[in-house]
Amino acid sequence: MMPTLNLHNIQYSQLDSKTWCATAEVTASCPLESLHLFDNLPSLFNANLLNIDTDKFSHITWHYHISNVSLSARKIAYQQRQQQRAGVRLLLQSLLNKLDINDSLDDVSFPYRLVNSQYYVCFSHTGASSPNTSTQPSGEKSFNELDNKVAVVISCHRPAGIDIETNNVEWRVAKRFYHINEIAILQTLTITQRDTVAKLLWQIKESFIKIYQYTLAQGLGMDYSHLMTCLINSIKEKPPLFVFEDDKTKYYLAYLPEQQTVIVY
């Protein structure tokens, strides 16, 4: 049984007359059946073993205790995937309701589209393991500690890409995958600027991967050094929404710093 999902801090943005996006945090309550509360019921309620007069059961004061549930790394990954898949679709429905659009998702093939309107849809979420994220401390976690951010973009014009990231890109990963022209510029920045721009580059690359269906290695190796001046300006100015056009692809790029989200549309 899937846990109950809840969306928090939903933020809607209209990027232009043909493009809308939404971001949110999705949390899940732990399903009762995973607690294994009733595994030992036969022995616990054997009146002979407990030496209890069953007639006196109604006079017994009962104390209930549910311990925290710890999940293995594999279980966490599985729960995250399930939670993210349901979470982005829940956010899509919320955005459709906001736009007063009565439609459903066709996710048979990429790019995803809405069935009736044929609008393009793209999802993103945090929490999935990927080579870009900094290593986090390992160990078991309670299911209720799992907290993921989700994002969705709808475009009635053409395929769009979106990427939401909370972790920086490790410098060794950037040097391995990024284009040599990008690395040359990144090396001239302060460490703080470098980490921020490297992360934005990753998000742009991920977004274009979703649009053009590049392989991961192919998409990460693309040269977007011509965009880096705009990216550097965006982190200096810190606007709530930063939009500029990529002259080479003729796509627009939007950066929402508060939501840690990049959209290519």
Predicted feature descriptions by range:
Residues 1-265:
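Core catalytic alpha/beta fold that binds nucleotide/phospho-ligands
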